[in-house]
């Protein structure tokens, strides 16, 4: 595994497990404590904390967590899977003996049984930073799940959500007004038809505040994508 080419910190989080077979997180309490401490530390270094998220399988665990916490939308039944047979929700809910919404008020159990390490750590970092810095969650469905977890745990502080125009349109079409749904301060970044992911909206928002237009950000992203795919200097067309 290659180390990131930027400052980073390790939380020691083990990989999540298959929620169809058992609890997805073996020590969610330790993950929460690590994330909370990290959030508090980072909040002391500036007046704003922007969080992105990237976790293999995160779209599935986010759907499972949101369904368990009572959120309703067709998109939550649209699991990205090529397998035939029962859906991830049908498997996990059968194991737990629950129906949609049965874990309302038991957010930590929902995250422990159905979530993933990044989901818990993102929520914990947000909670740890509350009161010390403005927190902006950057992403789509996974950050919506982190926000839902925080609200279920009783966090009433201000939570900001940055997302791209494309992702905001998709989420609003599925859930309605996101601000009303979870009391979020929503900031939408215009990156055309690019869906959010890995903190793209937050990074673009910070870059725009530093004088870089969205078009320039997109062009650079497509060029880098082309270089990665071809191993040679790419172009916007080559990176599509």
Question: Where are the language model's segments positioned?
Answer:
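N-terminal loops that bind phosphate or other acidic moieties
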Residues: 1-52, 56-240
